Amino acid sequence: MKLSSFKFTLPSKLIASHPVENREDARLMVVHKRTGQIEHKTFKDLIDYLGENDTLVLNDAKIFPSKLYGSKEKTGAQIEVFLLRELESGEHLWDTLVEPARKIRVGNKLYFGDGELVAEVLDNTTSRGRTLKFLFEGTREEFYEIVDQLGFVPLPNQLKRKPETEDRERYQTVYAQHIGAVVPPFAGLHFSAHLLKRLELKGVHITPLTLHIGLNSMKIIDVEDLTKYRIGSEQFLIPDNTVTTVNTALDDKKQVCAVGTSTIKALETSVSVAGRLKPAQGWTNKLIFPPYDFKVCTSLITNFHLPESLPLVNAAAFGGYELMMEAYQIAIKEKYRFFVYGDAMLII
């Protein structure tokens, strides 16, 4: 399929710069795959579409304030470092993006805060990419504590604003557990603890997996032929208890609802020949685009995504290309909010 098929005009005013006051008060478009029916609801109405013994699968990856501002040794020039991925746990070796890249060279030392963190540039990986070694003698947990104090929430440029205090809480799901992601699962941002409890009381099984989302969800795809697109690998874990819960739902012909395209990516990475979920841990660069035969998920919660973005392609693979493009035109007409802090869609 061609990338240009996913191009549409999105008014910039529909890109939400801030979240709604209450997570579950975002709007929810419900799209019925089989009939093409479209309903306009509020996110808390999700409870009406999930029943007893249905399963809701969450991505519990936790982001951290991964954007650091510092200075170069000797010159004192101001620099910016975006921590992308920890390369060796406990060794404080990181894959990063830096600005201004042309001034940050191998051998440079970079200082953050009042010298609480010092890093040495070990390698150039891309035009903006650098491998940094943080000269830090503490534990991994102590390192993250300092980063939490010095770092800023890495909001996407499309929001056109600097991070604010509320982003520390709102740019994170209420169920985040495992630190390592640089982007949160957008669809999960709509869940409040209250809504999750209501779902549990209704008999919905809520079960986690972990996929540490990288920058793929922020990027606009840069090749026309989607079969030639190469995405970075992301670390994931599907625990045994989630496998049992999901497979039981499939055996009982109950819904398996994935929260976010990162969740369907993890689930579809680890499917047996018989169409059942398997425990898995490792890295995935699975690319999902139309047409695609989903083996595990029966419904999907996702946000409204930017044109020519990977999450949009994933959503179209699940909901059907024509129906998704129709739904997006309706969303624009009805002034739904897009992107990270935008509204949600339930595809059933």
UniProtKB/Swiss-Prot annotation:
Pathway: tRNA modification; tRNA-queuosine biosynthesis. Keywords: Cytoplasm, Queuosine biosynthesis, S-adenosyl-L-methionine, Transferase. One of its GO terms (molecular function) is S-adenosylmethionine:tRNA ribosyltransferase-isomerase activity. It is an enzyme of class 2 (transferase). GO terms for cellular component: cytoplasm. It holds the Pfam family Queuosine_synth. Its main location: cytoplasm. It catalyses: 7-aminomethyl-7-carbaguanosine(34) in tRNA + S-adenosyl-L-methionine = epoxyqueuosine(34) in tRNA + adenine + L-methionine + 2 H(+). It is found in: Cytoplasm. One of its GO terms (biological process) is tRNA wobble guanine modification. Transfers and isomerizes the ribose moiety from AdoMet to the 7-aminomethyl group of 7-deazaguanine (preQ1-tRNA) to give epoxyqueuosine (oQ-tRNA). Belongs to the QueA family. Monomer. This is S-adenosylmethionine:tRNA ribosyltransferase-isomerase.
